[in-house]
Regions:
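N-terminal hydrophobic/helix-forming segments and targeting peptides
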Residues: 1-249
Length: 249
């Protein structure tokens, strides 16, 4: 809790033996910080103070990590390091990167970033649900697994030349790609980027993630590293002759 000072608390909700509740109201939830009185609480917190889950990241086995906000801290990390590595590889074109606000709601951040930069093409880097744990059927999000490498979006919005260039980059590195079928929309900032200007060629490179949108998301550092490598190789290979227009493909 971010009040007059940082406070640690736990969410309080008492369930009876075997009880499962689906009608939880906002008034049923509270945060227990250990205060002994209302007066003591009001000395340190006020209505409207922000609350967030603990931002610590825990290391798991097999190069996995767990924490909140890996969607999309992993994407931001990947883009930053891919740009640094692309420069080391001798990238020949100008590359802009943006971490954006509102991806889950209005996608306003991506829209304004593209309006300012006016790029030739765009690749979003985001996370995608996996289907490799109990209770998650592959029919829901596809056969995506942790540790299986980056997943490339395949759908009507995705630029075929962009996808092919990313596949070729992965092939040169010997990195296997998974595929995420994204009919209609990708569910990433690429959807809004595609609608900017006169229409922007886009695609998305996904990082597999378990338990998305929970306080304990799980990702693979190996997947992150491979996504960095593929994106950097793709960027380093771009030149002024690359044409992302599928109608001239």
């Amino acid at each position: 809790m971010l009040g007059r000072k940082r406070l640690t608390g736990v969410m309080g909700l008492l369930l009876r033996n075997g009880e499962v509740r689906t009608d939880i109201e906002l008034t049923d939830l509270y945060i227990d910080c250990g205060f002994t009185s209302r007066a003591e609480a009001l000395e340190l917190v006020a209505p409207g103070d922000f609350v967030t889950y603990s931002y610590a990241v825990d290391e798991l086995e097999n190069d996995c990590i767990a924490g909140r906000g890996l969607d999309n801290r992993l994407g931001a990390y990947t883009v930053l390091h891919a740009l640094l590595r692309a420069r080391e590889k001798g990238a020949k074109v100008g590359v802009f990167a943006a971490t954006t606000t509102g991806e889950e709601t209005t996608m306003r951040g991506a829209f304004h970033a593209a309006g300012r930069v006016r790029p030739t093409l765009a690749v979003a880097v985001d996370v995608i649900h996996t289907s490799d744990f109990s209770g998650m059927p592959p029919q829901r999000f596809g056969r995506i697994k942790l540790g299986g490498g980056p997943a490339l979006a395949k759908g009507s919005v995705c630029s075929a030349p962009l996808n092919r260039a990313l596949e070729e980059a992965a092939g040169r590195l010997g990195i296997p790609l998974q595929y995420a079928v994204t009919p209609g929309v990708m569910g990433t900032d690429a959807d809004k980027l595609n609608q900017t200007g006169v229409g922007l060629p886009v695609t998305t490179l996904f990082i597999p993630l378990r338990y998305m949108h929970s306080p304990s998301e799980v990702g693979s550092l190996a997947d992150v590293e491979q996504t960095v490598e593929v994106l950097a190789e793709f960027l380093a290979a771009l030149d002024e002759h690359f044409d992302p227009d599928p109608f001239r493909d």
